[in-house]
Amino acid sequence: MRILYVEDNPELRETIGMLMEGEGRMVTSCACAEEALVLDAGHPFDVLVTDVSLPGMSGTDLARRLLANDPLRWVVLCSGYELGSQPGSWGPNVRALLKPFELEELEQLLGGIHTALASVPT
């Protein structure tokens, strides 16, 4: 499972990025939505995990752009404030994770996504 992780805080980006690695997961991290679009353009990632508040283009705008190309893409929006029911209306595979989150929450979410992706016929 290929994960694109977008986080502007360098310490969080490095730590969370490393913690998401392993168990069939490859993580590519970047600091902004604009870089994420470039990285995703060549070979789309299976999952986008992004902070909502980013410099320049926001994480929500990034998610909308990527979902426009692939409405079934998995997206995890990480935010320090409640997003309400908004993300669920964007597509069936969009989830929100409230910051600060426990690593177990992220792990459980990614495990569920991995299982769902593995069950999709290729």
What are these regions (language model features)?
Residues L4, S29-V47:
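Acidic, metal-coordinating helix/loop segments flanking the phosphotransfer/catalytic sites
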Residues C32, S58-L62:
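Acidic catalytic/metal-coordinating carboxylates
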Residues D51:
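Active-site residues of response regulator receiver
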Residues D8, K99:
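A Lys-centered signature of the CheY-like receiver
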Residues F101-H114, A118-P121:
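C-terminal output helix
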Residues P55:
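The feature encodes the CheY-like receiver
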Residues N9-T28, V94, I113:
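Two-component/phosphorelay signaling modules centered on CheY-like receiver
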